[in-house]
């Protein structure tokens, strides 16, 4: 269970970093928002899923 928690936490950190870097880049490019809106929303959805997954797994690890 600890390994699953660590992998979920690592995925959360990676997705968070990608969103912190990627969203401003998308918004800064001309027509970037119109072309990449679904990608940004997918990343945000994955981020929220990982937040809840890490929270649930944390209750089993501790």
UniProtKB/Swiss-Prot annotation:
Which terms in the GO cellular component ontology are assigned? chloroplast thylakoid membrane; photosystem II reaction center
Describe the protein's quaternary organization and the partners it interacts with. Answer: PSII is composed of 1 copy each of membrane proteins PsbA, PsbB, PsbC, PsbD, PsbE, PsbF, PsbH, PsbI, PsbJ, PsbK, PsbL, PsbM, PsbT, PsbY, PsbZ, Psb30/Ycf12, at least 3 peripheral proteins of the oxygen-evolving complex and a large number of cofactors. It forms dimeric complexes.
Could you tell me the keywords of this UniProt record?
Chloroplast, Membrane, Photosynthesis, Photosystem II, Plastid, Reaction center, Thylakoid, Transmembrane, Transmembrane helix
The region annotated as signal peptide is none
Gene name, Swiss-Prot/TrEMBL: psbZ
Q: Which Pfam families match?
A: Ycf9
Q: Which residues cross the membrane?
A: 8-28, 41-61
Summarize the protein's role: May control the interaction of photosystem II (PSII) cores with the light-harvesting antenna, regulates electron flow through the 2 photosystem reaction centers. PSII is a light-driven water plastoquinone oxidoreductase, using light energy to abstract electrons from H(2)O, generating a proton gradient subsequently used for ATP formation.
Recorded topology in the membrane:
Multi-pass membrane protein
- What organism is recorded for this protein? Chlorella vulgaris (Green alga)
Write down what this protein is called. Photosystem II reaction center protein Z
Q: Which example biological process does GO assign this protein?
A: photosynthesis
The family annotation for this protein states: Belongs to the PsbZ family.
């Amino acid at each position: 269970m600890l390994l699953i928690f660590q992998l979920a936490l690592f995925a959360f950190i990676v997705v968070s970093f990608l969103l912190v870097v990627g969203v401003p880049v998308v918004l800064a490019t001309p027509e970037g928002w119109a072309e990449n809106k679904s990608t940004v929303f997918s990343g945000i959805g994955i981020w929220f899923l990982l937040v809840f997954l890490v929270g649930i797994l944390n209750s089993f690890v501790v």
